[in-house]
From Swiss-Prot:
Keywords carried by this UniProt record: ATP-binding, Chaperone, Cytoplasm, Nucleotide-binding, Stress response
Top-level lineage group: Bacteria
Stretches for region C: 553-626
GO cellular component terms, semicolon-separated: cytoplasm
Classification via CDD domains: HATPase_Hsp90-like
Subunit structure: Homodimer.
Compartments it resides in: Cytoplasm
Name of the protein: Chaperone protein HtpG
Length: 626
């Protein structure tokens, strides 16, 4: 009998999985039972596509058997079974999912719930066993095969005898160690508890022979043990249970069973609606961002059931994109089981459900923000960007739904605040909601442009996400207060007297500023005296709708079109540097060019923009140091 080797990457993955992916060894039973449920699902799917086959539910079950004396644990099912090739392909290559392959081969796009998407769950058996045997007979085949492995070194496959189709997994449970008690995985009570904890909603019976006691017939005062078969799981979907009977742990276990994530949900929503359209739904807001969430590969959607039967694995129409992070299920008796994807997309009932779900999610998030601020801020850290994308997309049509869910870091509060909180404490004379854009809060606090607004005592919101300013441009205003960047040309904070003084400064220094503008030859739209600078000598401001930060974001995209914002070089005429500029203008034009180039490049660096000629810049610094 030949021993075959796992592929090298499979060895590494097996080691990684055992030591990293699964933190609790009891998870192995959940994974193996889920695989058994998948196998029965596949039989059921075949009956839907083959009229000659009948599905008698009583014939399909999962059985768990413990043999404490021989340290053997068996998990058997009456599912579809596997051929020799399937054993080798599905179990010989870790992370090769048989369920996923079944979906591809049978074009199962919706209509069936097959849990095993990732192909690693089976190998959790090695958490508690160092000798794993799989005996399987495929549906429609006369041959059975035995697969055996004692770990990452390899496996064997040989013919064997098995009467009925299905699969039996036989685990030789490890001996106890000082750190681990493996005996518990042979105890009836422990096995029953694990099944109830993780697999209570598996829709096929999970059977065990449980030890019970009864009085002896010849002596009623003495008791004897006997075995009686029981179905351990309830098989009643959690969403059909009374909410008052469920605990947080029940929802968390369901979340884990459905593989919605390795985290715990930060919020669950259990809702039942009766009306024009009736449905039950359980929705989850995850705690952490899925690794692929902000990629094209991520697929949003809720599982859609009709009368308890899955008809679509991920129904994207049930969620708007900005709530695409929500996981969960919807079950409605008003949807037909055989409804096609095309009809479903235009189904009136489905649209009503989607509208209700959108409102429910929004209300729950608002409640979380109001009542559990810490949880909301944790959620926002993971998914706030998606809400801002929602404001920006579809030409701002969703801004009224999302604007009260937005949060930004505040210069005054030194924490995240909502727009409503900002507006509520605006001084009466303040006209605008001010914001500053930068790579981080620390960088923003050092921006020269922010000095004038802070000096006035006004609060500034910090925008550190690429999407922030784009979203706010689409929002335009909040409670009739317009948004204003601290880098915009007109801040709207000058008094009449100061405004006149500033204009007078521009007139007095008109020739100097014109000379500087000529030196920069088209790099800036204008050079003028700054109304905002207090301690810094120079900064860049922008005019028009396109800001400097938006220029950076757009030019970083793959279709770079070399977009340029209209920039204004602002000079602090109260800074010592300005005196040097005036002296150079009056007596040394070469020095004026040197100073102008240095100040412009300094302003570029402050904005995080690249300077055109770093060598010339460093040479100019050396010149003024001589």
């Amino acid at each position: 009998m030949e021993t075959k080797q796992f592929k090298a990457e499979s060895k590494r993955l097996l080691d990684l999985m055992i030591n990293s992916i699964y933190t609790h060894k009891e998870i192995f039973l959940r994974e193996l039972i889920s695989n058994s449920s998948d196998a029965i699902d596949k039989i059921y799917y075949k009956t839907l596509t083959d009229d000659s086959l009948k599905f008698e539910r009583d014939d399909y079950y999962i059985r768990v058997v413990s043999d404490k004396e021989n340290r053997i644990l068996k998990i058997a099912d009456t599912g579809i079974g596997m051929t020799k090739e399937e054993l080798e392909n599905n179990l010989g290559v870790i992370a090769k999912s048989g369920s996923l392959q079944f979906k591809k081969e049978n074009e199962v796009k919706e209509g069936y719930d097959i849990i095993g998407q990732f192909g690693v769950g089976f190998y959790s058996a090695f958490l508690v066993s160092d000798d794993v045997t799989v005996i399987s007979k495929a549906f429609g085949s006369n041959e059975a095969y035995k697969w055996n492995s004692k770990g990452a070194e390899g496996y064997t496959i040989e013919p064997c005898e098995k009467e009925a189709y299905g699969t039996e997994i036989i685990l030789k449970i490890k001996d106890n160690t000082e750190e681990e008690n493996y005996d518990e995985f042979l105890e009836e009570y422990t096995l029953k508890s694990i099944i109830k904890k993780y697999s209570d909603f598996i829709r096929y019976p999970i059977k065990m022979d449980l030890t019970k006691t009864k009085p002896k017939e010849d002596n009623k005062e003495e008791f004897e043990e006997y075995k009686e078969e029981e179905t351990i799981n309830s098989m009643v979907p959690i969403w059909r249970k009374n909410k008052n009977e469920l605990k947080s742990e029940d929802y968390e276990n369901f979340y884990a069973e459905k593989h919605y994530g390795f985290d715990k949900p930060i919020k669950y929503i259990h809702t039942s609606v009766d009306g024009v359209v009736s449905y039950n739904a359980i929705l989850f807001i995850p705690e952490t961002t899925p690794y692929d969430f902000y990629t094209k590969e991520y697929e949003k959607g809720l599982e859609l059931y009709s009368s308890g039967v899955l008809i679509m694995n991920k129904c994207g129409d049930l969620l708007p994109d900005y709530f695409g992070f929500v996981k969960g299920i919807v079950d409605s008796e008003d949807l037909s089981l055989n409804i096609s994807r095309e009809i479903l997309q235009h189904d009136r009932q489905l649209k009503l459900i989607a509208k209700n779900i959108k409102t429910k999610i929004k209300n729950e998030l608002e409640s979380l923000l109001k009542k559990e601020r810490d949880k909301y801020e944790k959620f926002y850290e993971s998914f706030g960007r998606q809400l801002k994308y929602g404001v920006y997309s579809d030409f701002g049509s969703n801004k009224d739904i999302l604007q009260d869910l937005l949060m930004f870091y505040s210069s005054k509060e030194k924490k995240m605040v909502t727009l409503a909180e900002y507006v509520s404490r605006m001084p009466e004379e303040q006209k605008y909601i001010y914001y500053a854009v930068g790579e981080s809060n620390e960088r923003i606090e050092k921006l020269p442009q922010i000095e004038g607004v802070l000096d006035k005592g006004y609060e500034v919101l910090y925008f550190t996400d690429d999407i922030d300013e784009f979203a706010i441009k689409m929002l335009m205003n909040y409670k009739e207060k317009e948004f204003k960047s601290v880098s915009s040309g007109d801040l709207g904070i000058e008094g009449e007297e100061k405004e006149n003084t500033s204009n007078s400064d521009d007139k007095k220094n008109k020739e100097l500023f014109e000379s500087m503008k000529d030196i920069l030859s088209g790099k800036v739209k204008d050079v003028r005296a700054s109304k905002r600078l207090k301690n810094h000598p120079v900064c860049l401001a922008n005019e028009g709708e396109l800001s400097i930060e938006m220029e950076k974001v757009l030019n970083a995209m793959p279709n770079n079109q070399n977009i340029k914002a209209d920039k204004v070089l602002e000079i602090n005429i109260n800074h010592d540097v300005f005196k040097s500029l005036k002296e150079a203008y009056e007596g040394d034009k070469e020095k004026l060019k040197l100073y102008t180039d240095l100040l412009y490049n300094q302003a570029l660096l402050i904005e995080g923009l690249a300077i055109n000629d770093p060598v010339e810049f460093t040479n100019n610094i050396c010149k003024i140091m001589k």
